[in-house]
Amino acid sequence: MRTGLIAKKLGMTRLFKEDGTHVPVTVLHVDNLQVVDVRTQDRDGYTAVQLGFGNAKVKNVSKPNRGHFARVKVEPKKKLAEFRVADDAVLEAGATLSAAHFVVGQKVDVTSTSKGKGFAGAMKRWNFAGLEASHGVSISHRSHGSTGNRQDPGKTFKNKKMAGHLGSERVTTLNLEVAAVDAEKNLLMVRGSVPGGKNELVLVRDAIKKARHAEAPYPAALVAAAG
């Protein structure tokens, strides 16, 4: 099991194939992604690597994190994320990862925060059918109807599907195909849509339900080794 990557969603575009057909893709940018820390079985009870994305201004970083970055001699980072890895896929702190970590044709899982839609009704939020257009129904056409039955149980249970805040949730899209990789510009192009809006940070990892691509570099594709 390899580490994943942290990337920024730049937006969507399309790629043209040799036969003239086009493929919609989401462009992800891997910006100065470095290994910040390593979790070990002996010390932490599990094996993982902590990655840091982009460079942050020192004034925007808390004092504990400043010391954390200084200890491994890396610039302060905007975003930190951990990825569980196998014992033989551990990377040294300070190593810089490349978008070439993934290869064309490989399947990946992408995790991010979905776009916030604000307060939404039951029809939009949960795909409810709503009430009838006529036959005695007035004003309540888009309502969700009864929520508590009658005297028994006489209450609305927790987690009942009702109107409320839609979006702004952690969402993972599975088995997206890598359509193109630009190692020089550190760009990753994934077929289809990815959760979140423009400039949202996303986590990209090998698809958990598919075997790892035979040509994918193991344990990782590095721009520069530690130190």
Swiss-Prot record:
Any GO CC annotation of this UniProt entry: cytosolic large ribosomal subunit
Modified positions (N5-methylglutamine) in chain numbering: Q151
The record's account of how the chain is modified after translation: Methylated by PrmB.
Signal peptide: none
Record keywords, A-Z: Methylation, Ribonucleoprotein, Ribosomal protein, RNA-binding, rRNA-binding
One MF term in the entry's GO annotations: structural constituent of ribosome
InterPro entries tied to this protein: Ribosomal_uL3, Ribosomal_uL3_bac/org-type, Ribosomal_uL3_CS, Transl_B-barrel_sf
Xref: Gene3D superfamilies: 3.30.160.810, Translation factors (2.40.30.10)
GO biological process, one term: translation
Quaternary structure annotation from Swiss-Prot or TrEMBL: Part of the 50S ribosomal subunit. Forms a cluster with proteins L14 and L19.
Protein family: Belongs to the universal ribosomal protein uL3 family.
Stated role: One of the primary rRNA binding proteins, it binds directly near the 3'-end of the 23S rRNA, where it nucleates assembly of the 50S subunit.
Protein's name in the database: Large ribosomal subunit protein uL3
The species this protein was found in: Gluconacetobacter diazotrophicus (strain ATCC 49037 / DSM 5601 / CCUG 37298 / CIP 103539 / LMG 7603 / PAl5)
